[in-house]
Amino acid sequence: MEMANDKVAETVIVGNYVEMESEGKPPQDIKSKLSNFLWHGGSAYDAWFSCASNQVAQVLLTLPYSFSQLGMLSGILFQLFYGILGSWTAYLISILYVEYRTRKEREKVNFRSHVIQWFEVLDGLLGKHWRNVGLGFNCTFLLFGSVIQLIACASNIYYINDNLDKRTWTYIFGACCATTVFIPSFHNYRIWSFLGLVMTTYTAWYLTIAAVLHGQVEGVKHSGPNKIILYFTGATNILYTFGGHAVTVEIMHAMWKPQKFKAIYLLATLYVLTLTIPSATAVYWAFGDMLLNHSNAFALLPKSPFRDMAVILMLIHQFITFGFACTPLYFVWEKTVGMHECKSLCKRALVRLPVVIPIWFLAIIFPFFGPINSTVGSLLVSFTVYIIPALAHIFTFKSSSARQNAVEQPPKFVGRWVGTFVINVFIVVWVLIVGFGFGGWASMVNFVHQIDTFGLFTKCYQCPPPTPSVPTMPPHQMNATAPSPHHHHH
């Protein structure tokens, strides 16, 4: 690294952030110290917690299902591969953010009560068509991200208390999640993201240890990968796992020194890999092909206090992740209605309510936990998180003057601008073909199959069939996530 250049860049950037830092130090009495510690987070650690905890939530439970579709080796390789791709695009987003912010602050724009979002970065650097595309994909993705959290809540609690069916649980959790309208911004998620990380860590190790202690099921088969359709569905679910950074810009904005963000995302991803690889491998090793019909890993493990604990922790975590996915939507909505700069919390909370209602509704229509992850992954994450940032980076720095005046030069080990350009083009092509093309096709076929099998407003997705005294559908149709041999779709 050329130290001199870095030093200059750093002073330029730090110069702009001085005012933000001085804001971040209110007078310290005990009460404000405590509220600061629990509530107002903007340090590098907070960003790390937010990234890591935001990345893993319910995906831990669907990864073994992906492994059963992909086979062991592909599963591990895809995780590493998409982990690296994800960190790279997060790095691009952070560069574009710092670039946008520095340009704006040279024009003396003040961002005190305004949260910068991804679409504004696109707007400022590339104009309004980019903004509209970015906004469209991002909002749809976050909308469905929130929907998935709701479905996951219902899907999980069912394993503790099955007196109510999953749809009723979705109603209940929808009402609970609506309370996130009262959390003003990402600064206020400090204690939550820390707890979230503790919870996912516990769950991941619970899955690993429980699966190993349980040992392999009799006659366990590991036949994956056998169907091309399932292979790509699984791969896309992994793409979705490491595409958790549609919220990257908002998390960065909540930091006091956003330029530290680049390394943080990579570290978060590395930590996440230590959770996802052991747990998915262990569960797949123990249960093999049984996972093809159980997209939620909790379904196969024996009931125990530890499992109940893991389920409860995941529930609390989903609540937090719901807040994470929804907060940017609230911001966009506030800006549309013109209430974003408003000081009164209650007014803003009221304005935000219409955002929660469609999410609630969608979660009741499509309760397919597992297949919906892959569908969202292929159709939305592929663009929001991989293709758009890579293209935006190419177009922002395509003129040589823009490259010379860039606040931050690309690192030497990737080969400066040429290397960066090559990597970006590779990402765009790869994700378009494998993620969006094959992945989209496979996920949509799988998704439509779920609708054909279960119907839209299905009451209880993948629940064990009721007692045999009532004539029911044959069991293989009740819980088919993979097309069963009786009815092939070609």
From Swiss-Prot:
Listed GO biological process terms: amino acid transport; auxin-activated signaling pathway
Lipid bilayer topology: Multi-pass membrane protein
Keywords of the record: Amino-acid transport, Auxin signaling pathway, Cell membrane, Glycoprotein, Membrane, Symport, Transmembrane, Transmembrane helix, Transport
Protein name per Swiss-Prot or TrEMBL: Auxin transporter-like protein 5
Residues exposed to the Cytoplasmic side: 1-55, 97-132, 190, 249-262, 332-352, 398-420
GO cellular component: plasma membrane
Function of the protein: Carrier protein involved in proton-driven auxin influx. Mediates the formation of auxin gradient from developing leaves (site of auxin biosynthesis) to tips by contributing to the loading of auxin in vascular tissues and facilitating acropetal (base to tip) auxin transport within inner tissues of the root apex, and basipetal (tip to base) auxin transport within outer tissues of the root apex. May be involved in lateral roots and nodules formation.
UniProt keyword Membrane, yes or no: yes
Glycosylation site residues: 293, 479
Transmembrane segments: 56-73, 76-96, 133-153, 169-189, 191-211, 228-248, 263-283, 311-331, 353-373, 377-397, 421-441
Record GO terms (molecular function): symporter activity
Pfam families: Aa_trans (PF01490)
Subcellular compartments: Cell membrane
Source species, domain of life: Eukaryota
Ranges per topology, Extracellular: 74-75, 154-168, 212-227, 284-310, 374-376, 442-490
